[in-house]
Amino acid sequence: AKALSITQSTEVGTVYDLDVLDGIHESVQRFDLSWHMDGARFANAIATLDVAPKEVTWKRGVDVLCLGGTKNGMAVGDCVVFFNRDLGKEFEYRCKQAGQLASKMRFLAAPWVGLLTDDVWLQNARHANGMANKLAQGLQQLGVRIAAPVESNAIFAAFTSEQTNVLRELGWIFYEFSGVGTARLMCSWKTTDAEIERLLADCESIVTPLAQAQDN
């Protein structure tokens, strides 16, 4: 069996909207594929699109969704949802064979109750997205180019190599993505305004002096 797998939201923080998902569904049908959605940050996509989860999953033809928990407030554990029940046959056995079956599985599953009750999962995602937008706006005001649209909780900031090095010396930890100088900055459910302001202050302290030095 062949399958198409997409990530929602994507690795660069963008979100597949309903029209794009419709187009993907047409291709999936044309080539007789199963459709898997990697939803490690699915909550962030739903928070951005402001639609019911069904609108971007089974109603668009998605067969299997991996719903992320660890990137939205949980200590451990993601959830696999089979909209196509046939694909879920013997899934428990496959989990066991892959080493994904814990002896106290209920302790991994129980936190989902708290995360899904009263839309906590969406509140967490909305907060993370909001912090990301605040950070992106602040960086743009400093003249830092944002390399990809900020549609979830990820910001890809095009710092220079010098700026990247100085930020790390100041204690900020981040990955460089798609080449040197593009910092992958992630905001979470627990990112605070104070943390954003502190990072922006550090960025301002290095962006302006380096820019002045280059002008001279």
Regions found by a protein language model. Give the residues of each.
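Conserved PLP-enzyme active-site core in the AAT-like
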Residues: 1-170, 175-191, 199-216
